[in-house]
């Protein structure tokens, strides 16, 4: 099992959360991609409890997602609520 996100999965996530064709930079897409990587890393760390290097990477990803969510919450609250509900994030 690889820790990264393969191209096929990435394309599916982008297609599902993109606002328009070719939209890879919107906060929704970025948050969805980060959430996928976070869930993968979380599963990895359940098996490998002493992998501190990956744990640090996980914390950085969570922080990045948190900043994107904060930005979306401040600028467009409806889009924020939508993405939190779609991804099932607790906040």
Curated annotation (Swiss-Prot):
Keywords of the record: Ribonucleoprotein, Ribosomal protein, RNA-binding, rRNA-binding
Quote any Pfam family the record assigns.
Ribosomal_S15
Q: Which InterPro entries match?
A: Ribosomal_uS15 (IPR000589), Ribosomal_uS15_bac-type (IPR005290), uS15_NS1_RNA-bd_sf (IPR009068)
Q: Name one GO cellular component term.
A: cytosolic small ribosomal subunit
An annotated Gene Ontology molecular function: structural constituent of ribosome
A single GO BP:
translation
The highest taxon in the source lineage is: Bacteria
Binding partners and assembly: Part of the 30S ribosomal subunit. Forms a bridge to the 50S subunit in the 70S ribosome, contacting the 23S rRNA.
Protein task: One of the primary rRNA binding proteins, it binds directly to 16S rRNA where it helps nucleate assembly of the platform of the 30S subunit by binding and bridging several RNA helices of the 16S rRNA.
Query: Member of which family?
Result: Belongs to the universal ribosomal protein uS15 family.
Name the UniProt record assigns to this protein: Small ribosomal subunit protein uS15
């Amino acid at each position: 099992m690889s820790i990264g996100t393969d191209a096929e999965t990435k394309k599916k996530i982008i297609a599902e959360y993109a606002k328009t064709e070719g939209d890879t930079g919107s906060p929704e897409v970025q948050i969805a991609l980060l959430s996928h990587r976070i869930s993968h890393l979380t599963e990895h760390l359940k098996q490998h409890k002493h992998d501190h290097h990956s744990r640090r990477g996980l914390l950085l990803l969570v922080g990045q997602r948190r900043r994107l969510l904060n930005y979306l919450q401040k600028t467009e609250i409806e889009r924020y609520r939508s993405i939190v509900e779609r991804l099932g994030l607790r906040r």
